[in-house]
A protein has these predicted regions:
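Phosphodiester-processing cores and adjacent nucleic acid-binding clamps
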Residues: 3, 7-242
Length: 243
C-alpha cells in the first residue's frame, strides 16, 4: 500500500450540469480543485468525475452543486485559479456575489474543508484578486492556502511548453492571437520561492503543508479488483458472452 495525495480540477457548471444552454454573459464553467482526504473521499472523487463525463459533458466534463453536495464527504476543496467562481466574480467587481459563492462552497464541504486559493504568477489581475481574497478570508472566517499553477516541471521548460502548446492548438509561435502562459512562472516552485511570493500570508503558506498532511489515501497495488459476474446455470463464459 502507498499513501497518496490525489486531486483533480473539476469544471463546475454555473447552474445544472444538465444545462447545455447559457444565458448572455454567463461562464460555461468554473474551475474547482478537489483533494481526496481519505479513501472515502477518493471514492467520492471518482464518482464526481465519472458523472461529470457521463451526465454533464458540454465542452468540458462538468459537475454541479448537486453532485458536490452528494459526494462531498472526505474531500477538501480549493477555490482554484483566476477561473474559479469566486475569482471570476471578483474580477467582474461583484464582490458580494464572490462572498456568496465562497460561503456556498464552505457550506457544501464543511468548515475547514474549503480554502480560498492565493496564486501569484506575476499577473496584475492576481494582485487585485489576492487583495480581495485576503479581506474575504478575514470577514467570512474562511481559511486560505497558497498554490502555484504548474504546467511544466522546471523554470527553463517554458519554451518547450510553449512549443507544445502551439502543437496542441494548431498555432504558430509567431501568432499573436493564441493561447499562452505569460511570465514563465508555471513550474514547480520550492518552499523558499513560495514563501518569498507570499510574505503577507504566512498562515496560508503553512496551510499548504497542513492540507498535504491531512491527505491519507491508501491504494493497494498488485490486486485485481475487477467486478465478478456470475454465469447463469447451463452456460459457460464463452457461450454466455457470444453474440
Amino acid at each position: 500500500q502507498r499513501q497518496m495525495c490525489i486531486r483533480d480540477r473539476v469544471y463546475v457548471a454555473p447552474n445544472s450540469r444538465f444545462d447545455k444552454e447559457l444565458t448572455g454573459g454567463e461562464d460555461r464553467y468554473y474551475h474547482l480543485v478537489l483533494l481526496a482526504e481519505n479513501n472515502k473521499g477518493y471514492e467520492n472523487l471518482m464518482k464526481i468525475v465519472s458523472r461529470g463525463f457521463t451526465e454533464g459533458y458540454y465542452y468540458k466534463p462538468r459537475v454541479d452543486m448537486e453532485l458536490l453536495q452528494e459526494y462531498h464527504e472526505g474531500i477538501i476543496a480549493l477555490s482554484a485559479c483566476l477561473a474559479g467562481e469566486v475569482q471570476r466574480y471578483i474580477q467582474k467587481g461583484l464582490v458580494d456575489e464572490a462572498k456568496k459563492a465562497a460561503l456556498k462552497y464552505q457550506d457544501c464541504f464543511g468548515k475547514g474543508n474549503y480554502f480560498l486559493e492565493l496564486q501569484d504568477h506575476g499577473l496584475p489581475e492576481q494582485k487585485l484578486v489576492n487583495t480581495t481574497l485576503l479581506q474575504m478570508s478575514r470577514e467570512l472566517d474562511i481559511p486560505m492556502v497558497v498554490t502555484n499553477d504548474v504546467h511544466y516541471t522546471y523554470a527553463d521548460d517554458v519554451k518547450p511548453h510553449d512549443i507544445l502548446l502551439c502543437l496542441q492548438t494548431g498555432k504558430k509561435l509567431s501568432d499573436e492571437d493564441r493561447m499562452r502562459y505569460e511570465g514563465g512562472q508555471y513550474y514547480v516552485k520550492s518552499e523558499e520561492e513560495m514563501k518569498g511570493l507570499f510574505p503577507y500570508a504566512w498562515e496560508a503558506v503553512e496551510n499548504t503543508q497542513r492540507i498535504a498532511d491531512r491527505c491519507h489515501v491508501e491504494i493497494e497495488f498488485g490486486v485485481t479488483k475487477l467486478p465478478k459476474f456470475d454465469v447463469p446455470e447451463g452456460y459457460n463464459c464463452l457461450l454466455y458472452t457470444s453474440p
